[in-house]
Amino acid sequence: MAKKSMIAKNKRPAKFSTQAYTRCEKCGRPHSVYRKFKLCRVCFRELAYKGQIPGVTKASW
């Protein structure tokens, strides 16, 4: 879980475009964030299993 200060810092606009990085909107994790959903892989998996992300289903082939 990210500190509140880091989450607040991420919400502010960066001075330079190269300083910007993605964080999970739910838990604040900085790595493995899917840009389309703004969620990390852990949170994405939780919400997908619960059926809270529309259009996402478990793959089967």
From Swiss-Prot:
One CC-aspect GO term? small ribosomal subunit
Keyword Secreted tagged: no
State any single GO MF term. rRNA binding
Q: Which UniProt keywords apply?
A: Metal-binding, Ribonucleoprotein, Ribosomal protein, RNA-binding, rRNA-binding, Zinc
The cross-references to PROSITE patterns, in alphabetical order and at most eight, read: RIBOSOMAL_S14
Cofactor stoichiometry and binding?
Binds 1 zinc ion per subunit.
Q: Which residues form a coiled coil?
A: none
Q: Which GO terms describe its biological process?
A: translation
Cofactor dependency: Zn(2+)
Q: Which residues bind Zn(2+)?
A: 24, 27, 40, 43
Described by its record, this protein's role is as follows: Binds 16S rRNA, required for the assembly of 30S particles and may also be responsible for determining the conformation of the 16S rRNA at the A site.
Give the family per the record.
Answer: Belongs to the universal ribosomal protein uS14 family. Zinc-binding uS14 subfamily.
Subunit structure of this entry? Part of the 30S ribosomal subunit. Contacts proteins S3 and S10.
Stated name of the protein: Small ribosomal subunit protein uS14
Write down the species: Streptococcus sanguinis (strain SK36)
Name the gene that codes for it: rpsZ
